[in-house]
């Protein structure tokens, strides 16, 4: 086994998805800037969007059925470079990393000595295949209190779930709300919730 490389005051920040409007890179570096203000160095690893396959279907399914997906050769080399290293923490957003499994059938993230923090930016059901992975040192962030409770209830192997308040600009005055000429809601992303209802109902009975 290779000698452990220690980066105890360094945080490793992955981006395995670009998210809506290519915001993954932005989130990673803004969070990294705040961490570095605390005197902690950050290391970034941006994996190309399609280098790690997604689960492949809309309906959530057991993680074991998704773990063996093949990874792009170049991305595989990037990921292998972190095996055996130690970090203060590993971060990613709607991460694909928990599904990755090594040749010895252990989880890839367990080969790096660091707690893994997965920022879940959607309803957790969308990420069942990664949240269900039984990592040794798994934590999650969510943007909604009920989402946190959902993760705690259905994924008890995740050690802790933290709610992160949404950032916002200064409060916009609503005094002239009635003067609005148009009432249009622009949805950045949309998935038909009926697709997931069957899965939600099945989880209720677990």
Q: Positions of the model-derived regions?
A:
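Short, Lys/Arg-enriched N-terminal segments with co-localized hydrophobic residues
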Residues: 1-8
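Short, flexible hinge/linker loops that cap or flank conserved catalytic cores
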Residues: 5, 177-178
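Short hydrophobic beta-strand segments
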Residues: 9-22, 183-194
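Extended catalytic core of nucleotide-activated donor transferases of GT-like folds
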Residues: 12-16, 24-153, 171-173
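Extracellular/periplasmic catalytic domains that process cell-envelope and extracellular macromolecules
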Residues: 110, 178-179
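Donor nucleotide-sugar binding/catalytic pocket of nucleotide-sugar-dependent glycosyltransferases
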Residues: 139-148, 157-172, 181-192
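Conserved small/polar residues in nucleotide/adenosyl-binding loops
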Residues: 204-206
């Amino acid at each position: 086994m290779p000698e452990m490389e220690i980066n105890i005051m360094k945080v490793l920040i992955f981006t395995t998805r670009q998210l809506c409007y290519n915001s993954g890179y932005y989130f990673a570096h803004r969070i990294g800037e705040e961490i570095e203000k605390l005197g902690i160095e950050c290391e970034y690893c941006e994996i190309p969007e399609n280098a790690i396959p997604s689960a492949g279907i809309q309906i959530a399914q057991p993680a074991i059925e998704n773990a063996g997906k093949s990874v792009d050769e170049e991305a595989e080399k990037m990921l292998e470079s972190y095996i055996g290293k130690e970090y203060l923490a590993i971060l990613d957003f709607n991460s694909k990393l928990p599904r990755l499994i090594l040749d010895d059938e252990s989880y890839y993230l367990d080969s790096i000595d660091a707690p893994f923090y997965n920022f879940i930016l959607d309803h957790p059901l969308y990420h069942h295949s990664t949240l269900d992975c039984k990592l040794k040192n798994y934590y999650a962030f969510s943007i909604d209190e009920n989402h946190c409770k959902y993760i705690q209830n259905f994924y008890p192997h995740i050690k802790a779930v933290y709610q992160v308040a949404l950032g916002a600009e200064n409060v916009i005055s609503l005094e002239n709300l009635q003067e609005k000429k148009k009432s249009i809601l622009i949805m950045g992303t949309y998935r038909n919730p009926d697709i997931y209802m069957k899965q939600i109902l099945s989880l209720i009975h677990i």
